[in-house]
Amino acid sequence: MNDIQNREDVALLVNTFYTKVRANDELGPIFNTAIKDWDSHLIHLTNFWESQLFRKNVFSGNPLKKHVEVDKNNNNQITNDLFGLWLQFWLGTIDELFEGQLANLAKDRARNIASFMFMEIFRSRQEK
């Protein structure tokens, strides 16, 4: 098995992962309601992860703001367990497709992002 080597590998990871997320009974309804144009969003997410893994400046956006909005639109029902499920799918998809230094970096970044996002979403709920 190879490591993540280029944008095409990142796109494979992102597309495979979100196919699972969209079909999941718990995560699917949240994502499928929030995202109207999946083709565009998958490109956007590929840009995000390409930026994270290869330090390329191809992503623009504010993921934290978007996730806070999604939580608000779901009556503040996004839980740490849902982030854990998201992370479980991400780590499992990486393990199915890749191994190596960048694969491990993608796992580490996702762990950090999930923790940070949930903490910031929780904090934003306190600001009401």
Question: Residue locations for each model-derived region?
Answer:
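Core of compact, soluble alpha-helical bundle domains
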Residues: 1-128
